[in-house]
């Protein structure tokens, strides 16, 4: 299986993914809320993707997308869902909550996207222990290590198994 990225799209023009995509000659598309709500679905549909991968994308995916791309939208979330999921639970908010609640472990969840924030079918989770002396920054670093290590592998495995 050859995994090929055909488009990198997002609403944050400063996202590192755009620099990386340009380096590899991959098409990019930066969009605003208006285009997201009116034109992005049609544009993505024209690309005929096997999979739509979300990483750091915070806007809710509309039902039009989840019904037309059923089991084709994968997201990574920096917690062990269902804990610390849902609206407002992203980035440092999650890791601060994990620390405040003195969780013994955290991790990542890779899941399918449905109509509800962070409620789609869980495809993969990886846990790490949190030593009591860890600061929020340490937790962030460890979780990002997991994301980098496992997300590409799980994307490839998912594509292999869905064919």
Feature-to-residue mapping (PLM):
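One-carbon transfer enzymes
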Residues: 1-163
């Amino acid at each position: 299986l050859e995994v090929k990225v055909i488009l990198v799209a997002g609403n944050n023009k400063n996202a590192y993914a755009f620099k990386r995509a340009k380096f590899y000659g991959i098409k990019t598309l930066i969009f605003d809320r208006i285009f997201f709500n009116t034109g992005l679905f049609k544009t993505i549909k024209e690309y005929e993707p096997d999979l739509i991968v979300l990483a750091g994308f915070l806007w809710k995916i509309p039902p039009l997308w989840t019904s037309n791309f059923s089991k084709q939208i994968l997201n990574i979330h920096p917690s062990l869902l269902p804990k610390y999921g849902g609206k407002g639970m992203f980035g440092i908010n999650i890791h601060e909550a994990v620390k405040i609640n003195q969780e013994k472990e955290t991790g990542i969840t890779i899941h399918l996207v449905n109509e509800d924030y962070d409620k789609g079918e869980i495809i993969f989770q990886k846990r790490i222990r949190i030593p009591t002396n860890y600061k929020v920054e340490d937790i962030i670093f460890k979780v990002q290590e997991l994301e980098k290590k496992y997300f590409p592998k799980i994307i490839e495995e998912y594509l292999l198994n869905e064919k």
